[in-house]
Amino acid sequence: MKISLSLQQDFQSPELELKRAQLKKIIETTLRHVGYKEDCEIGIACVDLEESHQLNLQYREKDKPTNALSFPSDIPEEVLPMLDALPLGDLVICIPVVLQEALEQKKTAQNHFAHLLVHGVLHLLGYDHETSDEDAEEMEGLEIEILAKLNIANPYQE
């Protein structure tokens, strides 16, 4: 499986260094865990509070910034055979929110970002925690298993 990663860092912080190789490892671990084997493309945009707030309001009608948003690709079925790699979609991650949540939850910023990346990739693959309690439990279970493979503790444990 080949992963093409587009990384746009509109907001950066010395507290959270993002390395392309590490991001690809997290994405690949997530994809392999759920049995995904195709070449794919994923975009990640790291944004500030203002942009996160604007996007969250525009797409989710929530008037506040959020940690992460996922935008699954909407490629027509008939186009897929013409593509070398399947565009899975884009993730927008708000670095200031990630840093604040990590502090509040007593986690490292790297581990919290990794969790949100796993969570977002699962959304791009069609997993959804807002449709039912069962779906939420399935998604959380997958996140815990994937993060364990990356030597990251269960993010839902107090």
Swiss-Prot record:
It is found in: Cytoplasm. Single strand-specific metallo-endoribonuclease involved in late-stage 70S ribosome quality control and in maturation of the 3' terminus of the 16S rRNA. This is Endoribonuclease YbeY. Its cofactor is Zn(2+). It is an enzyme of class 3 (hydrolase). Disulfide bonds: none annotated. The gene is ybeY. It comes from Acinetobacter baumannii (strain SDF). Keywords: Cytoplasm, Endonuclease, Hydrolase, Metal-binding, Nuclease, Ribosome biogenesis, rRNA processing, Zinc. Its EC number is 3.1.-.-. InterPro entries: MetalPrtase_cat_dom_sf_prd, YbeY, YbeY_CS. Belongs to the endoribonuclease YbeY family.
